């Protein structure tokens, strides 16, 4: 990530995730059955609606940020075979990711891999990110990620970040 985000931006974003973890620990202490629960477990739990929503939002946001931090490599990776099969080329895939990310006002752009089939989805409702399956790549398009390095210029951020997406992750099973 330090190829396209400054150390200060990465540290700020890491602190943001740490604060989300602290908030979740407060919810865990007030709802003991949430202690150690995974996202899919929380979906199935009988909880007060606001507890469930808060827990799902925080757990999903933490998980998506952790995925965001590992979705990039130190150098550009060649496209996985699944990318070439689904999109014809790495350039076509990255263009699709770019177009969707540019149109997304906030949230995450998530990439799912289903047995060689690749799907790019917008995610503005954190509770839905892990509902059916786990994404294998995440791109945070909220301004708080890139503002200190790129101002409000999302396009510059995307053009700098996208070449470093670790496309080899698209061959892994979620």
Regions flagged by a language model, labelled:
Residues 1-174:
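Feature for soluble, non-membrane regions of globular proteins
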């Amino acid at each position: 990530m330090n190829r396209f985000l400054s150390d200060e931006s990465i540290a700020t974003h890491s602190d943001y995730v740490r604060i989300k973890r602290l908030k979740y620990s407060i919810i865990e202490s007030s709802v003991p059955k949430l202690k150690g629960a995974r996202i899919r477990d929380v979906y199935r739990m009988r909880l007060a609606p606001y507890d469930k929503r808060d827990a799902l939002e925080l757990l999903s946001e933490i998980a998506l940020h952790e995925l965001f931090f590992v979705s990039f490599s130190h150098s550009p990776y060649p496209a996985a075979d699944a990318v070439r099969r689904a999109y014809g080329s790495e350039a076509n895939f990255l263009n699709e990711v770019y177009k969707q990310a540019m149109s997304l006002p906030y949230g995450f752009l998530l990439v799912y891999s289903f047995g060689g089939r690749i799907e790019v989805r917008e995610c503005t409702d954190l509770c839905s990110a892990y509902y059916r399956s786990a994404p294998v790549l995440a791109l945070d398009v909220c301004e708080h990620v890139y503002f200190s390095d790129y101002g409000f210029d999302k396009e510059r951020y995307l053009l700098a970040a996208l070449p470093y997406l670790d496309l080899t992750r698209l061959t892994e099973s979620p």
